[in-house]
Design a protein with these regions (language model features):
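N-terminal leader/linker segments that initiate helical-solenoid repeat arrays
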Residues: 15-54, 58, 65-66, 269
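Residue-level recognition of tetratricopeptide repeat
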Residues: 27, 61, 95, 129, ...
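Register position in tetratricopeptide repeats
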Residues: 65-66, 99-100, 133-134, 166, ...
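Canonical positions in the second alpha-helix
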Residues: 44-45, 78-79, 112-113, 146-147, ...
């Protein structure tokens, strides 16, 4: 009994520090993670120059790194109070509204950011995700078409290519989706979850071979599972699609875009 009391005394403060960031449609509470020092360092840097927008963004990014998304939203909002026309602040706050399933607010921020600066990759990419979530697949395809040429690295090129293929497919533009795969804009291979999904779309691997032994993190499982489920869905197999969407949600990787969209898919009749 004494040992149990000691354990509870250690765990309880951690629960208080790790705030509830999101409650799923099933009532599951998802919490932030513990800060390992990045937030403290960012706060210290900001304290030395509290009106420095770059340092405000750095603090919000550090908070996001441990899934403190609601805290990050407050930080970016603080920045917008100082710099109301800063497109990057809208990019980051819109992203975190998306993470916390505040889709209308995410759309507003990302659209405003795009009007302020149309050259920021992260604005178009996350705007595409929001439009996909809202089932505006044509709008999502347009956003990912804008994102793809300005992708900063191979990992982001794979992500943009993947979401563009899914958006075109769901919009009924199957020929354009196939032409995209044939063009291979994601080359060289990034070696991430999106690259693995693209191999499935191209017929290079079977659905049962998409996962590797290394794919164990919650985000990776959520991402791969949604991609496989959507692949089945566009091929007309809604039963298998649903089972993969359920696997995505069960992964617990709640910030993953795949899990966010899986929740939406599972609410459809």
């Amino acid at each position: 009994m004494a040992a149990m009391s000691t354990l509870l005394s250690l765990v309880a403060p951690l629960c208080l520090l790790q705030s509830v960031e999101y409650r799923s449609p099933a009532g599951v509470e998802y919490r932030s993670q513990r800060d390992t020092g990045a937030i403290a360092r960012a706060e210290s840097a900001l304290a030395a120059d509290p009106r420095n927008v770059d340092r405000i963004i750095a603090l919000g990014v550090a908070q996001s790194g441990v899934r403190q998304y609601r805290e990050a939203i407050a930080t970016f909002t603080r920045g917008l109070g100082l710099a109301p026309n800063n497109a990057l602040l809208y990019r980051w706050r819109g992203h975190r509204y998306l993470s916390t399933r505040q889709f209308d607010k995410a759309m507003d921020d990302l659209q405003r950011g795009a009007k302020l600066d149309s050259t920021i990759y992260g604005i178009w990419y996350h705007l595409g995700i929001v439009q996909f979530v809202r089932r505006d697949f044509r709008g999502a395809a347009d956003a990912f078409t804008r994102a793809l040429p300005i992708s900063p690295d191979s990992a982001e090129r794979a992500g943009s290519t993947d979401w563009l293929w899914m958006s075109l497919s769901r919009a009924g533009r199957k020929a354009d989706a196939q032409a995209l795969l044939d063009r291979r804009p994601d080359t060289p291979n990034a070696g991430n979850a999106y690259a693995q999904r693209l191999r499935l779309y191209r017929g290079e691997v079977s659905p049962d071979s998409v996962f590797t032994p290394a794919d164990t993190s919650d985000i990776q499982v959520a991402t791969l599972s949604y991609g496989i489920g959507n692949w089945y869905l566009v091929r007309g197999d809604s039963a298998k699609a649903r089972s993969w969407f359920e696997r995505s949600v069960a992964s617990g990787g709640w910030p993953a875009f795949g899990l966010i969209v899986s929740e939406i898919e599972l609410r459809r009749k």
